[in-house]
UniProtKB/Swiss-Prot annotation:
EC number: 1.1.5.4
Pathway: Carbohydrate metabolism; tricarboxylic acid cycle; oxaloacetate from (S)-malate (quinone route): step 1/1
Annotated keywords: FAD, Flavoprotein, Oxidoreductase, Tricarboxylic acid cycle
InterPro entries to which the protein is assigned, alphabetical: FAD/NAD-bd_sf, MQO
One annotated GO biological process: tricarboxylic acid cycle
Protein name: Probable malate:quinone oxidoreductase 3
Source organism per UniProt: Staphylococcus epidermidis (strain ATCC 35984 / DSM 28319 / BCRC 17069 / CCUG 31568 / BM 3577 / RP62A)
Keyword Oxidoreductase: yes
Family: Belongs to the MQO family.
Cofactor or coenzyme needed: FAD
GO molecular function, one term: 2-hydroxyglutarate dehydrogenase activity
């Protein structure tokens, strides 16, 4: 690649998304220089950290909100197929990084683990049965098993069935090809790889404090060393903001028009963590249920086996806790400083339209450990207070925006990618399934922000993600070959 193709790129945030974007960009050309800035002292400390999320490899195997019951009673599985395909793209990327020796020991960040859906009550059982009948016809999900038999459920989830009173209608489905992903460990491996690259400069304890676009389209990015308070200005052709909850404030500082009519509502995640090894070893699955009627998708309860630092552990949640910080290590002024003249009507409209979400958040805020334990006992009837501790995990900032389809103050559940008009800046906002589908974000960055350089990056992408540009949904043979290859590269056949 000629010197004329030289680019300076700034990546803000060294979480799973930022390190994934930087890793792919670093491979495209030695003439693309990447300055990467993380405000904390290391990579993957905020939402990507293994203690700050449930570690689900989101592939729509057990998450019921990706399969929607239609008015005629049929099940729409298109979103589930989309999420599954996106996770397969991420698996290809990770697997080829391992295969090429860029990162090592995949068992330190990904483990095979059954994914189970579990519901109670006739309405939910009927839904799960119909979901099973739909998914079993789709190649991506055709290994799914279903049961309404308590003895079978006892084999799948012995801890959850122990001393459970008979008489309640229950059902479960299971897919054995699920995974537990330690996104913190993966992020640190990607960061270590980037630290060795000659065309990457990764600096910790450096905070991006201002962004200004010049008349020539380039960006002036002001960065402050949080230890010395020294400020420097970097000139960038492209800027990617993957700073978790801090992305909205940075987008606002950039001055792009996409910042208007957009805001965020911060919510902390809380989990109950089991402290009794004898209990932990009785459960080996991720079990997702259905959100309570009238509650938002974030309220879906799940019981998660986790593998952290080589040890098996067990989490239940999430519970929510509201507060003004946009980051776990943020400021109590974050929410208030994000309310501007150009988004205040959006925020007010959201407050009016989303009373159930606000009520849920307040209910969660005042919930004690006793209340959390009572909810856990719907999953584990014999759960004892002394075996569990309640802790605060990561922050999520629910994106609030105006849209033609939903009107003013619409709350976005999921990941939102925002591009400037000239595609020189891209920001990732929102929440799950972001980490699992990180490679899809990488591809969107390349396709939108680097469209003129496709000749340079497309061969690299096809090497790292061989199915790029092809459909795993419509090509069963390709899907099965890809799964076999990624399972081998990631050492999942164990």
């Amino acid at each position: 690649m000629s010197e004329a193709n030289h680019k300076n790129i700034v990546v803000v945030g060294a979480g799973i998304i930022g390190t994934s974007v930087a890793t792919m960009l670093s491979k495209v050309s030695p003439n693309w220089h990447i300055d990467m800035f993380e405000r904390l002292e290391g990579a993957g400390i905020e939402s990507s950290n293994e203690n700050n999320n449930a570690g689900t490899g989101h592939a729509a195997l057990c998450e019921l909100n990706y399969t929607v019951e239609q008015d005629d009673g049929s099940i729409d599985a298109s979103k589930a197929q989309e999420i599954n395909e996106q996770f397969e793209l991420s698996r290809q990327f990770w697997g080829n990084l391992v295969k090429n020796g860029d990162i090592s020991n995949p068992e330190e960040f990904i483990q095979p683990l059954p994914h189970i859906s579990f519901v109670m009550g006739p309405t939910n059982v009927n839904f799960l049965r119909k979901r099973y009948e739909t998914l079993r016809t789709l190649p991506m999900f055709d290994t799914i098993e279903y049961t309404e038999d308590m003895e079978t459920m006892r084999k799948w989830m012995p801890l959850m069935m122990e001393n459970r009173e008979p008489g309640h209608q229950m059902a479960a489905s299971k897919i054995d090809e699920g995974t537990d992903v330690n996104y913190g460990a993966l992020t640190r491996k990607l960061a270590h790889y980037l630290e060795q690259k000659s065309n990457v400069s990764l600096k910790y304890n450096h905070d991006v404090v201002d962004l200004t676009q010049r008349e020539d389209g380039k960006w002036e990015v002001v960065v402050e060393n949080r230890e010395t308070k020294e400020k420097v200005t970097k000139i960038a052709d492209k800027v990617f903001i993957g700073a978790g909850g801090h992305s909205i404030p940075l987008l606002q500082k950039s001055g792009v028009k996409q910042r208007e009519h957009l805001g965020g509502f911060p919510i902390s995640g809380q989990f109950l963590r089991c402290t009794n090894p004898d209990i932990i070893k009785q459960h080996a699955a991720k079990v997702y249920s259905k959100e309570p009627q009238g509650k938002p998708p974030m309220t879906v309860p799940h019981l998660d086996t986790r593998y952290i630092n080589g040890k098996q552990t067990l989490l239940f949640g999430p519970y929510a806790n509201i507060g003004p910080k946009f980051l776990k290590f943020g400021s109590n002024l974050d929410l208030f400083e994000s309310i501007k003249p150009y988004n205040i009507t959006t925020m007010l409209a959201s407050a009016v339209k989303n009373v159930p979400l606000i009520k849920y958040s307040i209910d969660q805020m005042i919930k004690t450990k006793e209340g959390c334990m009572n909810y856990l006992r719907t999953f584990i009837p014999d759960a004892k207070d002394e075996d569990w501790e309640l802790y605060t995990a990561g922050k999520r900032v629910q994106v609030i925006k105006d849209s033609e389809q939903h009107g003013k103050g619409f709350v976005v559940f999921g990941t939102e990618v925002v591009n400037s008009d000239d595609n020189s800046m891209i920001a990732l906002l929102g929440e799950s399934p972001g980490a699992s589908t990180s490679l899809s974000v990488v591809l969107e960055v390349l396709e939108k922000n680097f469209a003129d350089d496709k000749e340079a990056w497309e061969p690299v992408v096809k090497e790292m993600v061989p199915t790029y540009g092809r459909s795993l949904i419509n090509d069963e043979k390709l899907m099965r070959e890809t799964r076999r290859e990624t399972s081998k590269n990631l050492h999942l056949n164990r």
